[in-house]
Amino acid sequence: MNYIQTEIDGVWLIEPKVFHDARGYFMEAFKEEEFRAHVGNVHFIQDNESKSSFGVLRGLHYQKGDCSQAKLVRVIKGKVLDVAVDLRKSSPTFGKYVSVELSEGNKRQFFIPRGFAHGFLVLSDEAVFTYKVDNVYAPQSDCLLYTSDAAD
């Protein structure tokens, strides 16, 4: 896999090596040892999947405090524009964002560390989106970032 550090520290774009032949393709979607060597010691505890139609905007969600989640996201069907916004107040990139296109064609993955809001917009007729998280969902800590929110 090719690990690409984005312009925001801790946010990674990961490009798997895909092997094609007459039968289709094969790729390793996740290798814990390799992931930790590049990204750090993140222990994923759950995999989630969602299906959405064209034009659906999911997010920008985040969980506060100890309930914060790191995510490793990818698209297995369709195409999305995926966005991570830095909410770490002590970060020099606080309020900045990274956006990437994830699709079944490019097979890229996007790692978003704790302390970020995350969301995506579906660009294809439908998209199946899957992601690993390192913490359980805590509804009492769930927040939604709106485009009109002040960056403070």
Roles of regions detected by a PLM:
Residues M1-G105, S124-E126, V136-S148:
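Non-catalytic, conserved peripheral segments adjacent to functional cores
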Residues L102-S124:
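Conserved metal-binding segment of the jelly-roll/cupin
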Residues I112, D149-D152:
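Hydrophobic heptad-repeat coiled-coil signature
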Residues V128-K132:
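Active-site scaffold segments
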